[in-house]
């Protein structure tokens, strides 16, 4: 896949993730959109393949962190915050085993 296509794919993926992560939060949606667009415009004249690969790697890492780590919270009262985790972040209870497993 060409470099230009990779850049466009990461750009679109970041915006999709932004829309999913910050759903119903216009302030965060706008701030994230501005930041993504600003960073891509700042580096649009980059020609070094090594630098482009590093920037793509960074963009993928940012997209992964947004998708896997960010949870929305909303102030509903002076001392209350409601968390709105996405279904993709919820995990089933996993049994915890404190005893080391025996090697055979």
From Swiss-Prot:
Organism source for this protein? Danio rerio
Source domain of life is Eukaryota
**What protein am I looking at?**
Complex III assembly factor LYRM7
What exactly does this protein do? Answer: Assembly factor required for Rieske Fe-S protein UQCRFS1 incorporation into the cytochrome b-c1 (CIII) complex. Functions as a chaperone, binding to this subunit within the mitochondrial matrix and stabilizing it prior to its translocation and insertion into the late CIII dimeric intermediate within the mitochondrial inner membrane.
GO BP terms, alphabetized: mitochondrial respiratory chain complex III assembly
User: What does the sequence similarity comment in the record state about its family?
Assistant: Belongs to the complex I LYR family.
Subunit info? Answer: Interacts with UQCRFS1.
Q: Which residues form the signal peptide?
A: none
Q: Where in the cell is it found?
A: Mitochondrion matrix
Q: Name one Pfam family in it.
A: Complex1_LYR
Question: Gene Ontology cellular component?
Answer: mitochondrial matrix
Query: Which molecular-function annotations from GO does this UniProt entry contain?
Result: protein folding chaperone
Question: What InterPro entries does the entry give?
Answer: Complex1_LYR_dom, Complex1_LYR_LYRM7, MZM1/LYRM7
Name the keywords, alphabetized. Answer: Chaperone, Mitochondrion
């Amino acid at each position: 896949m060409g470099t230009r296509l990779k850049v466009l794919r990461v750009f679109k993926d970041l915006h999709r993730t932004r829309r999913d992560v910050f759903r119903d939060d216009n302030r965060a949606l706008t701030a994230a959109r501005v930041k993504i667009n600003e960073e891509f415009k700042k580096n649009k004249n980059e020609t070094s393949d090594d630098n482009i690969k590093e920037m793509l790697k960074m963009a993928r890492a940012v997209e992964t962190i947004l998708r896997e780590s960010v949870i929305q919270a909303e102030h509903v009262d002076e001392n209350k915050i409601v968390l709105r985790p996405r279904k993709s972040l919820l995990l089933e209870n996993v049994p915890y085993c404190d005893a080391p497993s025996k090697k055979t």
